């Protein structure tokens, strides 16, 4: 990969943390100068790293002060983008960091009106793991809106009552 001719987003998508750091060095830039850069679709470097399953880069960006709750033109935040990859190694740890940093669990994306927590829960329930379950319970502890419906008329409450684990259902009861 030619680092000189590639932008940071391309390096994140097709490269690795080493190439990302090399690009910074070549351009003589400090990470703080570019950490919150966004592309024409409003997607941040952090979001690109989550989409591309480059969780080492995501952690580096978070350690370097990347902001959370950057909203793309599709009205998605970092958790929406991470949800599709939540069952990949390292994803839950990054998701926990985002939750601890105050990610907006209730933000609804434009196409289906799914909240970030809905998107996350839906993906976690496709491949049930203890760490995924614990993540949803942690999110429920932040008291997201469980009754708000997406464009299909389904709420987080409905999703958990129908398909959730016992731990999720218990956390839901505490909220009621």
Region roles according to the model:
Residues 112-142:
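Conserved binding-pocket/active-site segment within a compact domain
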Residues 145-176:
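Leucine-rich solenoid repeat scaffolds
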Residues 10-16, 48-54, 81-91, 119-131, ...:
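Ankyrin repeat A-helix N-terminal signature
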Residues 8-9, 13-17, 23, 27:
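N-terminal alpha-helical scaffold/docking segments in eukaryotic complex subunits
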Residues 24-34, 59-67, 96-105, 134-146, ...:
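Ankyrin repeat domain, specifically the short helix-to-loop turn at the C-terminus of the second helix
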Residues 40, 47-55, 60:
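N-terminal accessory/assembly segment that mediates macromolecular interactions
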Residues 1-8, 53-58, 86-102:
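Glycine/serine-rich loop-strand microenvironments at binding/catalytic pocket rims
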Residues 2-9, 33-48, 71-85, 108-124, ...:
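Ankyrin-repeat boundary/"N-cap" motif
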């Amino acid at each position: 990969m030619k680092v000189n001719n590639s932008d940071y987003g391309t390096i994140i998508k097709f490269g690795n943390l080493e190439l990302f750091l090399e690009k910074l060095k070549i351009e003589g830039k400090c990470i703080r100068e570019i950490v919150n850069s966004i592309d024409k679709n409003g997607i941040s470097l952090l979001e690109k790293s989550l989409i591309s399953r480059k969780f080492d880069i995501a952690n580096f960006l978070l350690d370097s002060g990347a902001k959370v709750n950057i909203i793309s033109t599709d009205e998605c935040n970092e958790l929406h983008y991470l949800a599709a990859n939540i069952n990949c190694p390292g994803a839950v740890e990054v998701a926990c960091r985002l939750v601890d940093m105050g990610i907006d669990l209730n933000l609804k994306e434009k196409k289906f009106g799914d909240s970030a927590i809905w998107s996350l829960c839906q993906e976690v329930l496709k491949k049930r793991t203890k760490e995924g379950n614990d993540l949803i319970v942690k999110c429920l502890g932040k008291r997201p809106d469980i009754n708000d419906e997406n464009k299909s008329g389904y709420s987080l409450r409905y999703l958990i009552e129908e398909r959730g684990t016992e731990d999720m259902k218990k956390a839901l009861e505490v909220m009621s």
